[in-house]
Amino acid sequence: VVLAKQITDSFHELAETEGINFTVESLNEPLLLWIDVEKISSAIRNLLSNAFKYTSPNGKVIFKMNRIEIDGYSFCSIIISDTGKGIPEELRGRIFESFITGENTPLFSNKVGIGLRIVKNTMDLHHGTVNLDSTLGKGSTFTLLIPEGNAHFAEDRYEIVGTPEMEEYALPLP
């Protein structure tokens, strides 16, 4: 909740400057999230930046954060929606791939098409999801679902594959 406030506070001035109605709806209760704060912050900022970039003056950007239950598990739900240009249907299935950009480019852009891929990778690392709902000419809604607690990390299994050179420097396990 504190993190969400820190991130959204930084967009209020932009909203005023651009003439965009920016609404923030957040929980009043804490969520227990085991996250990489920098990565999650970056993902949220990326989505908010895109929302502002593609929304015209007098448009709306909405940030909502709540707790939801899915199949008995608690998730933090972060919804970022806008009344911007929307994403063409032919791009929606590939929008989270690297270097994908659309025709609806803002007037000034230095985009390279990796922002949404970074969001997707961040959510994958946190055992979460990112979903898109978009209507061309009406706007887009991105929903992030981040598992609450830390039980989801028990699912991680890693296999370390080494080379003969690595074995020379390996320390024996107790």
What is each residue range found by the language model?
Residues 16, 21-31, 68:
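Conserved catalytic submotifs in the C-terminal HATPase_c
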Residues 51-52:
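Short helix-loop "hinge" at the ATP-lid/N-box region of the Bergerat-fold HATPase_c
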Residues 87-99:
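Short conserved segment of the HATPase_c
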Residues 100-110:
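Glycine-rich ATP-lid/hinge loop adjacent to the conserved G-boxes
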